[in-house]
Amino acid sequence: MRIAILTLILISLGVPAVAQEADVKPNAEQVSNTDVTLLAGADYASGNVNGQGYETLSLNTGISARSGRFTLAASIPYVVTTAPEELIVSNGGVLGTPLLSQPSTQSREVTREGIGDLILQGGYSFPIGSLDAFIAGNVKVPTASREKALGTGELDYGLSGQVSRRIGRTVPFASASYTVIGEPEGFDVQNTVAGSVGSHFLLSDTSLVTASYSYEQSATANVEDHQSIGIGLDTGLSTRIRLGVDARAGLSSDAPDARLGLRIGIGF
């Protein structure tokens, strides 16, 4: 199921979704064609950790390729963030918490920018009875500057999976992931689990709305686990171009208070 696959890619990579198809195919059907999609998008997040505020803007670019049931995707952001200098702000996604906090008496706020971490994912979709399933391996390559506190400077990797089922014009889904976090110098980190539940609502053959709840375990004891709710709209501008917008609101104290996203996918 394309919707299930593409939703997980979006959740896992934190990048724009691939050009989605709203006409969901039966899970018994083997898709044999090959698609390549160029990805672009922007994400804005703001919040506070331990009373320290931050704002982050990520400009993402990437590519996704699908052949039959196999999917490969890669993305890399350019990050601009304003935050206390002792906070490490990463590009988020399944392979790291959006924010790592190191205990410090410093509180000077600084603005830094640069290339974020490269995210790679390889996945496979398959049916389980009446369900559509997708499983993927994920790697975060530490291309972001550790000196600028735009990343941890360490390699992360993990597994993620999602199941979904179409019921009329509704497609409920649930996803989960486990991530092995590379430990940066000066931080005590732990591996993390994350998950989300929600549903797609098919408005037409080319448009859908998604509502979801997400939980993400913190990689450090200095930051609380994240909980949030979100809503998004994805629609086709043409047979090759899709546009998506989404918004999330934090439910826990250390989760981003607000997160806004804009994405576009151009298929070939």
Question: Model-flagged regions — what are they?
Answer:
Residues 20-183, 192-268:
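Transmembrane beta-barrel domains of Gram-negative outer membranes and organellar outer membranes
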Residues 187:
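Active-site cleft segment of glycoside hydrolase catalytic domains centered on the general acid/base Glu
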Residues 1-32:
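Cleavable N-terminal export/targeting peptides
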